[in-house]
């Protein structure tokens, strides 16, 4: 398989690095192939069609260049010295003739359904591929610090999606070493997060996540929790290993002046609270978020609440929160194909 370091800049653009790597691998034996919405085209950079050249996203290593054709497809032009124009044209049409339809995997956040996507788009590539604990310890610490610094800049929306690439170049120039990139892969069994809001993939590699140290897991989930707060402006942020639990007072609270009380719980405290039962209120819908050990099925709470069991794991709590907050489209990488 192609060395992921050679396609690190694809990760900075938010593309699924594993799918790109697999596509590049298959391209070695075929003139062109489409894998998960990423089309591989044999030919040199000079032969790239004009409409791709005008929308060039940036080089990814010595032999590959990425071009964005439209919001639903990305072409990667691989450089082969002996490629002819005919071979290149054949490769260009390969994906369209193969029966595979363009997939959103390459540009997973193409729809602006929530309106306030600019800030999220700028931050997601960095969060997905630098700050989730699968890279080097140095990269994790740096991204964690950067995330904390960014948490107070929610309203600015400044910066560019190219910032990650610049940071990488600066780091490489100073240290002489290429910054290690993290690979986030959707779980193989996506059915575990289906239903309620619909099928989706949470951007976790389950095996790597569960095999990583507890401190790494918690750091990853904390970063996602902060991302949720920025994205949805929710006061519903409850994670049981010591993060802040924001509990809205239900009685006599004006929507314009919400009253929130912050508590800090351990996982054991959280389980005790589950047994006792307590209620949180969704900031926007005002629907109750039911944390009740007597009910485990999300579908049993038609108002849109979350029902948890003391047997829930940290990850299952996270997934239920994501589904409840309606972030499945925001955080999903793709629907399985």
From Swiss-Prot:
Phosphorylated by host kinases. Phosphorylation play an important role in facilitating trimerization and possibly P-L complex formation. Keywords: Chaperone, Host cytoplasm, Phosphoprotein, Viral RNA replication, Viral transcription, Virion. It comes from the Viruses. Residues 77-110, 136-194 are annotated as: Disordered. Its main location: virion. One of its GO terms (biological process) is viral transcription. One of its GO terms (cellular component) is host cell cytoplasm. It is found in: Virion; Host cytoplasm. The keyword Phosphoprotein applies. Residues 90-99, 172-182 have a biased composition (Basic and acidic residues). Homotrimer. This trimer is stabilized by binding to the L protein. Binds N(0), and N in ribonucleocapsid. Essential component of the RNA polymerase transcription and replication complex. Binds the viral ribonucleocapsid and positions the L polymerase on the template. May act as a chaperone for newly synthesized free N protein, so-called N(0). Plays a role in virion assembly. This is Phosphoprotein. It comes from Tupaia virus (isolate Tupaia/Thailand/-/1986). The lineage of its organism: Viruses, Riboviria, Orthornavirae, Negarnaviricota, Haploviricotina.
